[in-house]
């Protein structure tokens, strides 16, 4: 195997990270010469990055092929018509890059390929006998991120492995989904990632069920609620919990209005002279679900989860109502709102409030609130419905056992969906079933962010000196360096490099005319798993220095044995 000579390689390392780099992976990928920024959310992948990304892709291919996946390569440029068939042309909004050709035709740069693969299935699949099918590709995607940041974690151009399963029924989809789940677990394990699979929100993808694969890291933008006792785990967009029961008094026979001039926040109502604890307040929020008003009610000390509201309403998009939209509907401005006997819009109430009594809420009159509210009597009895709306908090009870939930930041590295017939029905992708009837194909969708795997690995595996790569995705398995300019050291190092190559070990040979300290620092920064140093003292005794990047002590290894030792280390770790 051919070694790469450092003196001839393009590895533009830096002593300092960019001023705008905030997360470890961004800092280290730039400092180690893996990436350079071309524009906001757009990166050049330099040779070291290309080597590591190619290894990630190879692992993904092996595991996809192992479950019967067949690789495609479909266009990144899509005509608008196919996205309009599914209804997602408008749903994607500003997140989609859109363009016109010279004839005025509408196109987009693909964010994902559900529509495109469904079109292939519609045109080519005719019978249940052709199913199941598992198709995938590793291809460039585009997303017009409003705030690209954190290096490779939030970009506008990225590489995704997207796979799609096609089955004749739900049972087949269940099998395909589990095949993908197991394949994902193998992929992430091989890439050296400590991950957790969690229940997730399907969002604009649609479908009946989805799971995200998450890496726990402060660099993540998602929040996961997990129970260490029973292993329940879910994105907070879908997570539920047990809330401790409140000891409510009997309340009043009917709500009673009282003056609250200038009180327009939960916190203000907690203060004297009113002194109403937040947990005894009803927080009433006005949202627009597909531009239709909906009222959401949660406890005063709880936060509304917009993803849950979207699920509860079945809306494509939800947003907070603008201040000027609220008074015509509610009769008051924000801060004095309530849902008591309210029937002018759909009202959703979090289940944790169902049996609460003696609560306080806005009176839908500026400067006034109501006390003595019985949620079931005064809200639910007038057409409101229960729906999971609140965001769970750390310390709340697990919904599956007697444990308590931990909530932590996490980074999504993969997402799998049971799409069902969402796309096949809208795009008329059908096959004949065993009874000769036309039925919509039952689909699944499965995505992995290739660059995110690289970035996540670095977030998990780094120290003060640089990257600490897992062997399977390191740009090289080993680096060989000399500890002096003497010809005999160079000759011995060349022989070690050749022996390593014969064993299949990928080597970066640091043949630069630099001090040993510089070479050691660069080796640590690049994160190459094995460091082999050839020095005068050791060589005189027939040895070389061996050190593992992952916290290993320096060992002396006979020159004739080092290649075998390295090959064994590579095989054990990949």
Swiss-Prot record:
Catalytically driven reaction(s): tRNA(Pro) + L-proline + ATP = L-prolyl-tRNA(Pro) + AMP + diphosphate
Gene Ontology MF annotations: aminoacyl-tRNA deacylase activity; ATP binding; proline-tRNA ligase activity
GO biological process: prolyl-tRNA aminoacylation
Catalytic activity, EC: 6.1.1.15
Cellular component annotations (GO), alphabetically ordered: cytosol
Principal EC category: ligase
Subcellular location: Cytoplasm
Keywords: Aminoacyl-tRNA synthetase, ATP-binding, Cytoplasm, Ligase, Nucleotide-binding, Protein biosynthesis
Pfam families listed in its UniProt record: HGTP_anticodon, tRNA-synt_2b, tRNA_edit
Quaternary structure and interacting proteins, as annotated: Homodimer.
NCBIfam families documented for this protein: PRK09194.1, proS_fam_II
Functional description taken from the UniProt entry: Catalyzes the attachment of proline to tRNA(Pro) in a two-step reaction: proline is first activated by ATP to form Pro-AMP and then transferred to the acceptor end of tRNA(Pro). As ProRS can inadvertently accommodate and process non-cognate amino acids such as alanine and cysteine, to avoid such errors it has two additional distinct editing activities against alanine. One activity is designated as 'pretransfer' editing and involves the tRNA(Pro)-independent hydrolysis of activated Ala-AMP.
Family designation: Belongs to the class-II aminoacyl-tRNA synthetase family. ProS type 1 subfamily.
Domain remarks in the Swiss-Prot or TrEMBL record: Consists of three domains: the N-terminal catalytic domain, the editing domain and the C-terminal anticodon-binding domain.
HAMAP family: Pro_tRNA_synth_type1
Protein's name in the database: Proline--tRNA ligase
Gene of this entry: proS
